[in-house]
Design a protein with these regions (language model features):
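Conserved functional acidic sites
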Residues: 7-233
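C-terminal motif of bacterial Sec signal peptides marking the signal peptidase cleavage site
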Residues: 2-5
Length: 233
């Protein structure tokens, strides 16, 4: 009897989930981005909106400082749907190892995935960041240092912006709700063979004012959403 062949036939190998974070060169995903910023303490001018479009392209490969294969991601932007993408907004870097997927966003590194993908699995997505870095990028002094990312709705279908994806995973990064104080909701959805298709990031701080009506509140924070509009190679 060939024991190795019996093992292969009778044992179900674990699903790793690399397909949810593709690294193939030339692949791209396009997004519509909507964001709202608010700061009640500076009066009527304390709010703004931004609406634009992004195209993320896995442009080339290289070896990073730790000797790992990595991807250079060119992020193009435009203000409306007309015309093509010609303006490079950012250069990011992606590294996918056998155990994790990292994304370097202007020298801020997030652990986007922890393999193998499994329902309910958790990890600290900010393990490579300092509290000072998080306070700076989110503009909140009381932002938590540890964000326990969690896999939810693993291999479930997902519909967004007219697309229906057969197999997706949701990464709930943080869900902290407060009537007063800091509320944070951060979540990303990844489709198999495509990558990120929906991102939500809401960071809102509601405080009682130092002066004035004690029943009034001041709001400071932002809401940010990315929704897939196209993808391919």
């Amino acid at each position: 009897m060939n024991l190795s062949s019996c093992y292969l036939e009778d044992t179900e190998l674990p699903f790793i989930g690399y397909d949810y974070y593709p690294t193939g060169l030339g692949t791209y995903v396009e997004y519509q981005v909507d964001s709202v910023w608010q700061d009640d303490q500076i009066g009527p001018i304390g709010s703004a909106e931004a609406h634009y479009f992004l195209r993320d392209v896995n442009e080339s490969s290289f070896v990073d400082e730790e000797g790992r294969p990595a991807i250079r991601v060119e992020r193009y932007s435009k203000q409306n749907q007309l015309g093509g993408f010609s303006n490079i907004k950012d250069i990011w870097y992606r590294t996918r190892t056998s155990k994790i997927a990292e994304q370097n966003e202007e020298n801020v590194v997030f652990i986007k995935h922890n393999f193998p993908v499994k329902e309910g699995k958790t990890w600290d997505g900010n393990s490579k960041n300092t509290l000072q870095t998080l306070q700076l990028i989110y503009r909140q002094t009381n932002i938590p240092k540890v964000w326990d990312y969690e896999y939810k709705n693993v291999h479930e279908p997902y519909t967004i912006n007219g697309f229906t994806f057969d197999s997706t995973i949701t990464v709930l990064q943080l869900d902290r709700t407060a009537t007063l104080g800091l509320s944070v909701f951060a979540q990303e959805v990844y489709a198999k063979g495509i990558g990120l298709v929906h991102k939500q990031l809401n960071v809102i701080d509601i405080q009682l004012p130092t002066f004035g009506d004690p029943f009034d509140t001041d709001t400071f924070g932002f809401q940010y959403e990315m929704v897939v509009t196209d993808f391919g190679q």
